[in-house]
Amino acid sequence: MIVDFKELRIPLIHPTYPPYHTGKYMEEYFYEFYLNNKKEFDQTGFTLIPIFWTNVYIMEGKGANKRRLIQPYLNALPQGKYFTVSQHDDAVAEQLPEGTLSFEGGGNGKGIPLPLICSKMPTKPTINKKDIFCSFVGSASHPIRDTIRETYINDSDFQLYMKPWTHAIPDAQLNFFIDITNRSKFSLSPRGYGAQSFRFYEILQLNSIPVIVYDKKWFPFEDEIDYESFSVLIHADEICNLKNILNNISDKQQKDMLKRGKDLIGMYKYTK
């Protein structure tokens, strides 16, 4: 069997998500980067499995009927050293060749964590004085988010706006998220369907302190990055203590965390 992964690099015909994103998605961008730097990659001894996982997974529900090809193609690969890159929450669900390095942005798999990123937000923070202690604007897409709402919905220090998840996000809703986040000292970044959220990197861009609420530890490059220097890490079991934890962070600490967050923003991008 000739393995032609071109069949698994299909275009994505789907509402843009997040709505401000422009250009390629992670797998598409990395494939181009790989081709442009193939000599350097070849020196590592590893070969890319060039599947646009996100496109194939999403388009399966739109009648593309390509996902059925993935496992036979993987099974037909000659023995060797491989790696792959994926963004979709559920990738990679198929059985990869033994020893394959799977770099994953979604967080529902068991691979090597990658940041879940896209292009920059089309706005810069304009508010320096924060009039909101802690906020969340987003979808009710995981029990952790439900628990946060149930715990703090009646607390005036929290502004929580949750709705059912939808593919399309109107401009008014995006602008509301930007405004509320920019005005917040702390902005909640609880996991949704996937272990990661675009929200974490959006919060950094909007000059707020991310509060990562997690049940599964999924922190990309944690051997290189001190997450607690610019964000607050809250396990799901600690949601009831979340406010006390935030209240114990001094104004000086908050200022230092915001500065550190700004310093790190440049690491979380793959488009200009």
Predicted regions and their residues:
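Nucleotide-sugar donor-binding catalytic core of glycosyltransferases
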Residues: 1-201, 205-206, 212-234, 240, ...
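C-terminal helix of von Willebrand factor
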Residues: 244-245
